[in-house]
UniProtKB/Swiss-Prot annotation:
Protein family according to the UniProt entry: Belongs to the FAM10 family.
Keywords, sorted A to Z: Acetylation, Chaperone, Cytoplasm, Phosphoprotein, Repeat, TPR repeat
Organism of derivation: Homo sapiens
InterPro entries: Hip_N, STI1/HOP_DP, STI1_HS-bd, TPR-like_helical_dom_sf, TPR_rpt
GO cellular component: cytoplasm; cytosol; extracellular exosome
Biological processes per GO annotation: chaperone cofactor-dependent protein refolding; protein folding; response to bacterium
Region (Disordered): 38-97, 256-300
Gene this protein is translated from: ST13
Role: One HIP oligomer binds the ATPase domains of at least two HSC70 molecules dependent on activation of the HSC70 ATPase by HSP40. Stabilizes the ADP state of HSC70 that has a high affinity for substrate protein. Through its own chaperone activity, it may contribute to the interaction of HSC70 with various target proteins.
Biased composition (Basic and acidic residues): 49-73, 256-272
TPR repeats: 114-147, 148-181, 182-215
Residue(s) carrying N6-acetyllysine: K353, K360
Biased composition range(s): Gly residues: 281-300
Protein's UniProt name: Hsc70-interacting protein
Residues with the Phosphoserine modification: S346
Amino acid sequence: MDPRKVNELRAFVKMCKQDPSVLHTEEMRFLREWVESMGGKVPPATQKAKSEENTKEEKPDSKKVEEDLKADEPSSEESDLEIDKEGVIEPDTDAPQEMGDENAEITEEMMDQANDKKVAAIEALNDGELQKAIDLFTDAIKLNPRLAILYAKRASVFVKLQKPNAAIRDCDRAIEINPDSAQPYKWRGKAHRLLGHWEEAAHDLALACKLDYDEDASAMLKEVQPRAQKIAEHRRKYERKREEREIKERIERVKKAREEHERAQREEEARRQSGAQYGSFPGGFPGGMPGNFPGGMPGMGGGMPGMAGMPGLNEILSDPEVLAAMQDPEVMVAFQDVAQNPANMSKYQSNPKVMNLISKLSAKFGGQA
């Protein structure tokens, strides 16, 4: 299973433990039913949650929701993280050092010369002549650019010169050549420690000790590891907070969508009821209707008073097609127009919906006249 999904689920479960009312929302019904079907028991909702579930909820204040979400966000990643930065230095910005031509053909003579340069560089290093050691290691690298130990040795001098970025470049090159050597990881770990890169330092120093245990690397690992762990815990904390915010936002979106759907249903129901009232022969039929309609049918609006005894009325109102036409605003507007002025029927000769209703009513009333 995707670890990210597992983390999201863990954050959701934690949120449910803190606020069981989340489980009593309508969209979480499926989860409640599943828990209960497995023999589990869902904690009761708070009184507030119950009242919200049983009454129509007001539309949530989106600004308040946004403010609540922002309140959970840290002002910065370092907002409540305090790390001892003793020994951390500013990064060096020198131009990259010479790395030699890795595609050059290396002769045995060049290898011997490179070894001589390496020996001289180590002597200079032991004498404290650090820059001389750098120059000699560089000469050795140019003679034999595919020997990982030369880069690792030069990196150790860069660390002593407090040039951690230069040391990291040398260690990266040494690891490319021989990833199983402990020395490049040791010196890269020390360089990262100088820069305050605690997690990277802990990773490299631990790997160096794993490949070839070194007391010096182990001592520095013990120094940086607590800081690296503190940073990792800090990151996990805010990842959990972010996941909890995402879950809250999803629940809020579902809640808003449900409210929008319910509001749309209420509006549709109101429109349907309004249409039903509108389709009840408003305004009567003054002056009679052509086609054998009886001479005027006044008083038909608002429930058609006075027509209860009209022959055939119940049959007309039970006809599905007539009822459907009475629900159509276009048909009823035309019907009113013709009722007020029968001569206007000619305007609707080409409208089958209007003519169909008039024909049906004419037939019904004509049969009773």
